[in-house]
UniProtKB/Swiss-Prot annotation:
Keywords: Oxidoreductase, Phosphoprotein, Signal
Keyword Heme part of the UniProt annotation: no
Organism: Schizosaccharomyces pombe (strain 972 / ATCC 24843) (Fission yeast)
EC number: 1.1.1.-
Protein name: Putative uncharacterized oxidoreductase C1773.04
Record Gene3D superfamilies: NAD(P)-binding Rossmann-like Domain
Top EC category: oxidoreductase
GO MF term set: methylglyoxal reductase (NADPH) activity
Length: 336
């Protein structure tokens, strides 16, 4: 019988692609979800998953032993569940609550994995945010690698209502919790963190554009008619969600002793997105923001070479990612 993988948060953007990648490579999948309506929406687009995937409801990832039942009998755990704002417009989630959900959710997933003797590896979906924070605090030209850590602290996050700051500290502390758990408990399994930047690509887990996660919401604003001219870029590196899913699959069995991998498809700016959208979907030129003419707005670099060397990853071109993301969002909005 093929090996069984537990994915937390399977109704989310990242985890739904993770499940698709695992199924395509012959793994059995068990996924946790929080809300029935989100699972129903996912299954409308993937009805075959009703028979292919086991689903376990976990209403609160902070509850004691939240994932213990879900982890019974599994060979691997991918912790992808996260609580983060869908967008930057009201109503927003309490940023202080997000901090504690991130930490406790990760620890509970680790506790469950440690109680299941079959588990070989635990993969945590961290973030580039755990490396650098909401902005580059390390100076112009810094090259971020697996050695870097966001310098912002829990106290700074708790004293701030800045949602992006809180999110970056969430990801840092969630990942720190993973490394600390391993150091403290020396479990049988190996734990690996993946640190992706802004995650883009096609969406298939939703029924409308009303509940997009942050990264796809950001992308949607550039092509839906909100802006006449693209705003200045605030995010400078991306990865295709399908490449991140492949990274998770490879991280389960790769021959590596590393516990952290920077994941990145490369640098981009907002003009790159709108130029691709205009090239492939000229019928929506009145909705797509015009390029703003930025040259090189990013003042840092991200080195993802370890993921290529140790995990054997290849990253697809940005044009493919942006084209497929644009097409899927227009279809989701009923425009194609």
């Amino acid at each position: 019988m093929s090996e069984l993988v537990l994915i937390t948060g399977i109704t989310g953007f990242v985890a739904s692609h993770s499940a698709e990648a695992l199924l395509s490579q012959g793994y059995r999948v068990r996924g946790t979800y929080r809300f029935q309506e989100k699972l129903d929406g996912l299954l409308k687009n993937r009805p075959e998953w009703e028979k292919k995937v086991e689903f376990v409801q976990v209403p609160d990832c902070r509850a004691p032993n939240a994932y213990v039942e879900a982890a019974k009998g599994v060979d691997y755990v991918i912790h992808a569940a996260t609580e983060v704002h869908s967008n930057l417009e009201p109503p927003r989630k309490d940023p202080h609550e997000l901090l504690h959900i991130a930490i406790q959710g990760c620890e509970n997933a680790l506790i469950a994995a440690a109680q299941e003797p079959k588990v070989k590896r635990f993969v945590y979906i961290s973030s580039e945010a755990a490396l650098k924070g909401p902005v580059n605090y390390f100076g112009d030209g810094h090259v971020f690698t697996e050695k870097d850590w966001n310098p912002k602290t829990l106290r700074e996050a708790e004293e701030s209502d800045d949602e992006l700051l809180n999110y970056t500290v969430c990801k840092k502390l969630g990942e720190r919790a993973m490394h600390a758990f391993v150091a403290r408990n020396t479990p049988r399994f190996q734990a690996i963190a993946l640190n992706p930047p802004l995650i883009l690509g096609p969406v298939f887990h939703l029924q409308s554009v009303d509940n997009l996660n942050f990264s796809t919401w950001f992308f949607w604003q550039l092509i839906k008619g909100r802006y006449e001219v693209a705003p200045e870029s605030k995010f400078f590196n991306y990865v295709d969600v399908r490449d991140l899913a492949e990274a998770q699959v490879k991280a389960l069995t790769a021959k590596t002793d590393k516990d952290r991998f920077v994941i990145s498809g490369g640098a981009f700016k907002n003009d790159d997105i709108v130029n691709v959208a205009l090239k492939y979907f000229p019928q929506f030129k009145d909705k797509i923001a015009k390029p703003n003419g930025e040259t090189s707005p990013c003042n840092y670099e991200v080195d993802a070479s370890l993921s290529i060397k140790e995990l054997g990853l290849t990253y697809r071109p940005a044009e493919e990612t942006f084209k497929d993301a644009t097409e899927s969002l227009y279809k989701l909005a009923g425009l194609l």
